[in-house]
Swiss-Prot record:
NCBIfam families in alphabetical order: yfcH (TIGR01777)
SUPFAM superfamilies named among the record's database cross-references: NAD(P)-binding Rossmann-fold domains (SSF51735)
UniProt cross-references to InterPro entries, sorted A to Z: DUF1731, Epimerase_deHydtase, NAD(P)-bd_dom_sf, SDR39U1
Name of protein: Epimerase family protein slr1223
Superkingdom field: Bacteria
PANTHER family reported in the protein's UniProt record: EPIMERASE FAMILY PROTEIN SDR39U1, SUGAR NUCLEOTIDE EPIMERASE RELATED
Record Gene3D superfamilies: NAD(P)-binding Rossmann-like Domain
Length: 307
């Protein structure tokens, strides 16, 4: 297949691209920095890959490369783990909403349109709660990230009017050793100073990065996948259980909680995502034949950390 990707140099994309290339697909990466893409994916090792510079929120010549592609994978968006100033919140919103709108605009202009578009979203769609359990049919929340996700998904759904199959993944907290939440939590645990963030009672709806990549890979060719799917493992845990399990796998204690105020100073409004959380279940995925490689947390952490 000829596949165009955004967000290819991010935490998920860095593992997705090698898999797709190994399968023999022709990959076009839309990136802000071609040099960064070439450092990550050396031309000698990735002969069927090309990187094209683009500004995600603006129309431009880059849109022409969408013509003739078989699939579009849209994972771009500013990281939400930075401190949320008002200016940065605008970047979080625009990079997702406008970035997706410009991709759909490019598809609309294409003479030969892709068969499928796979677009990221997040479980932040549901807002946060310590008591509710969310599935794909649950109503959206009303906080900032819920607003972002709704706008992001609404932009993606426009592609369906063009006859393109759309798969939206509401992605949970992605676990992998070299990035994301786990990489930030490992150092204090290894120094015997790990512990739960905040009260520890908040839900932590996670997914192993390998399972997320497998879901994206399946969505490329399985025409029965259509619509919205929660990309989370079937066994979410509370933060205190996550930290206890991480300590067990590392043979380290989980005894030193990080107080709310420290996270609020570090992340500002974004601390709410860590301190409140949500319990999200992959109801739609459970009705497919997809099999999780890491359905439970300890299995995932042991595979990731090699213990």
């Amino acid at each position: 297949m000829k596949i165009i990707l955004t967000g290819a140099t991010g935490f998920v994309g860095c593992s997705l691209v090698p898999l797709l290339h190994q399968q023999g697909h022709e990959l076009t990466l839309l990136v802000r920095s071609v040099s960064k893409a070439q450092r990550l994916f050396a031309p000698g090792s990735f002969p069927q890959l090309k990187a094209i510079a683009y500004e995600a929120t603006k129309s431009g010549d880059w849109q022409k490369v969408v013509d003739g592609q078989d699939a579009v994978i849209n994972l771009a968006g500013e990281p939400i783990s930075e401190r949320w100033t008002e200016a940065y919140k605008a970047e979080i919103f625009d990079s997702r909403k406008l970035g997706t709108e410009k991709l759909v605009e490019a598809i609309a202009k294409a003479d030969r349109k892709p068969q499928v578009m796979i677009s990221g979203s997040a479980i932040g769609y549901y807002g946060t709660s310590e008591t509710a359990t969310f599935t794909e049919s649950s109503k959206p929340g009303d906080d900032f990230l819920a607003e972002v996700c709704q706008a992001w998904e609404n932009a993606a759904h426009q592609v369906e009017q063009l006859g393109v199959r759309l798969v939206v993944f509401r992605i949970g907290i992605v676990l992998g050793a070299d990035g994301g939440a786990l990489a930030k939590m490992l150092p204090p645990f290894k120094l015997f100073a790990g512990g739960p963030l905040g009260s520890g009672e908040q839900w932590f709806s996670w997914i192993d990065r390998r399972d997320l990549i497998a879901l994206i890979d399946k969505a490329l060719t399985d025409s029965t996948l259509r619509g919205t799917y929660n990309a989370t493992a079937p066994n979410p845990v509370k933060m205190k259980e996550f930290c206890h399990t991480l300590g067990k796998v590392l043979a380290r204690p989980s005894w030193l909680p990080v107080p709310d105020i420290a996270l609020e100073l570090l992340l500002g409004e974004g601390a709410k995502l860590v301190l409140e959380g949500q319990e999200v279940l992959p109801g739609a995925i459970s009705k497919t034949d997809f099999q999780f490689q890491a359905p439970d947390l300890e299995t995932s952490l042991r595979q990731i950390l090699g213990s």
